[in-house]
């Protein structure tokens, strides 16, 4: 069981994840918006949500943007997750690689990115509610 302090930190991170999701959702419909900020905020929402769950389950994790690493870490600790999240590692390059390079990039599947981020936010909030209750 996480301590009240851990729950507070997890709650703060969950709120930041929700802000990233809201930002991605706001930017995504605009066809003139470059994919980079949309992908970045979707990736950040997923990353923060996974970290919230790891934190609440007492799993230590390094400072990383690597979603595959974080997802495998959750799986190693038998943490069940939404099927959409099991393959969310495709969002990892949007955290830094594409954000700091103006070379041509792959096209972001915006609907998929938002759907994965939504699933991640729902997942972490459900666990947060359970741990708070």
Q: What spans do the regions from the language model cover?
A:
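Terminal alpha-helical segments
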Residues: 1-133
């Amino acid at each position: 069981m996480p301590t009240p302090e851990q729950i507070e930190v997890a709650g703060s991170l969950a709120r930041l994840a929700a802000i990233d999701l809201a930002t991605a959702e706001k930017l995504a419909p605009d066809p003139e918006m470059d994919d980079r900020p949309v992908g970045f905020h979707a990736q950040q929402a997923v990353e923060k949500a996974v970290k919230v769950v790891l934190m609440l389950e007492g799993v230590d994790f390094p400072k990383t943007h690597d979603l595959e690493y974080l997802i495998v870490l959750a799986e190693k600790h038998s943490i069940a997750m939404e099927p959409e999240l099991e393959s969310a590692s495709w969002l990892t390059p949007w955290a830094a690689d594409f954000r700091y390079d103006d070379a041509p990039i792959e096209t972001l599947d915006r609907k998929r990115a938002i759907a994965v981020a939504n699933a991640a936010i729902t997942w972490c909030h459900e666990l947060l509610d359970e741990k708070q209750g």
